[in-house]
């Protein structure tokens, strides 16, 4: 009986030891696993950081590249729109000049007419001369007058086989002596263009054939006399009249009716 009790106690102690050992083992293993997991997680974060930074930089670069390409595309489109807009404005200006030339051509008594495009005009000599794409081969000749933008702008100074140089009225060294007539009411006074006043942007007319009154606003046209013999081309309007110190001669200043700055097409006119 005593032996049975001892065996029972031994079994209880053994089972208790097993349970305690199992509990301790489970707790220790859980702690190790937790610490090991924390360590692995830390290493993973450290390893992932450079890759995350690289991905972020890569994304930023891709965004910048897209933005740059979009800006370049927009700039190109804007440039193309500006070019087209300039082309349209240029065509409108040229068409208006052509309409004015056709209207004036129908009113002039000229036996020779020739339309030509401006192909060269140097900034250095912008107010002195320009070159046309038509020459002797197309009928251009000296003593022809040049009209554009509704009025007289100059005269032919040199003719080559395929080009013509026009001497502009705004050339301060112009010595072509084109005849003009001033209409004051029913009175017509003839004179000669003797130069250009660049300070006041006016033509100077002298050698008048009459002492008749001349007023500001009187119309001035070509006289049709001398070498340049096409009459009634609009020249401008009288601005003022001044007398010489001895009152024997008068000088008339005239505002040009034609814009000589912006010229694309010109009509050369003359009489054989």
UniProtKB/Swiss-Prot annotation:
| Keyword terms of this UniProt record | Cell membrane, Cell shape, Coiled coil, Membrane, Transmembrane, Transmembrane helix
Record carries keyword Cell membrane: yes
User: Cellular location of this protein?
Assistant: Cell membrane
Instruction: Classify the protein's membrane topology as the record does.
Output: Single-pass membrane protein
Q: Would you kindly state one Gene Ontology biological process term found in this protein's UniProt entry?
A: regulation of cell shape
A Gene Ontology term for the protein's cellular component: plasma membrane
Q: Which family does it belong to?
A: Belongs to the MreC family.
Any idea what job this protein has?
Involved in formation and maintenance of cell shape, probably part of the elongasome which synthesizes peripheral peptidoglycan (PG).
Protein's UniProt name: Cell shape-determining protein MreC
């Amino acid at each position: 009986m005593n032996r049975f009790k001892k065996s029972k106690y031994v079994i209880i102690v053994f089972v208790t030891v097993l349970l305690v050992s199992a509990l301790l083992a489970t707790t220790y293993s859980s702690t190790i696993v937790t610490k090991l997991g924390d360590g692995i997680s830390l290493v993973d974060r450290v390893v992932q950081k450079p890759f995350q930074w690289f991905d972020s930089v890569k994304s930023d670069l891709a965004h910048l590249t897209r933005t740059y390409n979009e800006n370049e595309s927009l700039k190109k489109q804007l440039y193309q729109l500006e070019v087209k807009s300039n082309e349209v404005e240029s065509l409108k200006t040229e068409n208006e000049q052509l309409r004015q030339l056709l209207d004036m051509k129908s009113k002039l008594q000229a036996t020779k007419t020739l339309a030509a495009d401006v192909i060269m005009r140097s900034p250095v000599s912008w107010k002195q001369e320009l070159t046309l794409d038509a020459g002797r081969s197309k009928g251009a000749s000296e003593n022809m007058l040049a009209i554009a933008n509704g009025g007289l702008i100059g005269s032919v100074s040199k003719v080559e086989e395929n080009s013509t140089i026009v001497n502009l009225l705004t050339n301060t060294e112009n010595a072509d002596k084109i005849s003009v007539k001033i209409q004051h009411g029913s009175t017509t006074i003839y004179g000669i263009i003797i130069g250009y006043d660049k300070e006041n942007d006016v033509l100077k007319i002298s050698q008048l054939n009459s002492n008749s009154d001349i007023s500001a606003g009187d119309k001035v046209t070509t006289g049709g006399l001398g070498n340049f013999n096409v009459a009634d081309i609009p020249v401008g309007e009288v601005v003022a009249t001044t007398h010489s110190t001895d009152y024997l001669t008068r000088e008339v200043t005239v505002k040009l009716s034609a814009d000589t700055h912006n010229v694309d097409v010109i009509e050369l006119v003359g009489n054989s």
